[in-house]
């Protein structure tokens, strides 16, 4: 064989070898491609994966796994960053898997952070403004008292709205016991309420002031004492005697009751003089509405029941002897009978019973008062044919009602009529 033939043979062998190596390499690359399924599969080190797979990485072991996305998982997968084949081929096999870069998500996140920062800054500013303007109840009360002191001594129409607003705020604040005492300690009775109740010509202001008075005295023994010491009892009695305004009478009754309830000394001093006469004058007035008259008999009934309750409890409580002694002095029977309480109630019910037919709550108030004061008025009421007619008319109307409350009131009236007239069989009108 010549040398030329040997060279040709060796060249052919080399070419064939290269082709085999290239084919093997291509086969290896194909077998090394990641084929995704619906199950999790381990990703080999350096192994490329197609886009759009669900990828998870164990941060402790470094194990990477991937699978096809479910429909509910679209848009949540980790994906390799290169978009084109050239970029993927040039990518280092050892470089970690990257998230898709989504400028819109990043910009949105930045925008939200800035908005939150702005909102927080605005919140801090608003809070500082709130702190600057914040006032405790005590500070508000002192401020309102000072505001009243700065009003003109002569009544000005331009100040009326401001005065009413001040009184409305005080009525709300003084329901609390401590606030009421702070108002009193800072001169509120002398500088605000007393001048209005005694001297002011505005009915609206007097009504508002008496509401404030009732608010601060209700269930507040220390405040009741201060109000009593300022002689508000007599001033309220005068208003009840002379006023014909429905709102003013209602407000005066509220303040009057707040002063007297659970305060036997005030009851003795006020009711033994002008107080009882003032209440009965309200009952006798043809210009006063029935609801206000119901408030009068309710107050009288409450005070009579209060005395009875205290005396009953004190019998078994030696420590209550001083309280009992104060209530023993209360002679409601003579205070009520002398100015004509029994006759006044008789007249109200006899003349206005038709109005009671549609006011069961008012009927109950009168029925309770009749029961409470029955002992001192039996001789008058049992002989009154007008009263009997009125009570039986209302009772019969309510007895035929389908309303449960009216039925209960009718039963109360039936028992009352039986005791007063002792003729249960007579139900004719």
Curated annotation (Swiss-Prot):
Principal place of residence: endoplasmic reticulum
Biased composition (Polar residues): 75-84
tRNA processing is among the record's keywords: no
Example of a GO MF term: adenyl-nucleotide exchange factor activity
Keyword GTP-binding: no
Subcellular location: Endoplasmic reticulum lumen
Keywords assigned: Coiled coil, Endoplasmic reticulum, Glycoprotein, Protein transport, Signal, Translocation, Transport
Basic and acidic residues bias spans: 85-94
Cystine connections: none
Biological process annotations from GO: SRP-dependent cotranslational protein targeting to membrane, translocation
Motif range (Prevents secretion from ER): 426-429
Residues spanning the signal sequence: 1-24
Entries under InterPro entries matching the protein: ARM-like, ARM-type_fold, Hsp70_NEF-Inhibitors
Region of interest called Disordered, as start-end residue ranges on this chain: 70-98
Annotated glycan sites: 29, 150, 199, 400
Residues forming coiled coils: 104-135
Gene Ontology terms: cellular component: endomembrane system; endoplasmic reticulum; endoplasmic reticulum lumen
Family: Belongs to the SIL1 family.
Function: Required for protein translocation and folding in the endoplasmic reticulum (ER). Functions as a nucleotide exchange factor for an ER lumenal chaperone of HSP70 family.
Record-given protein name: Nucleotide exchange factor Sil1
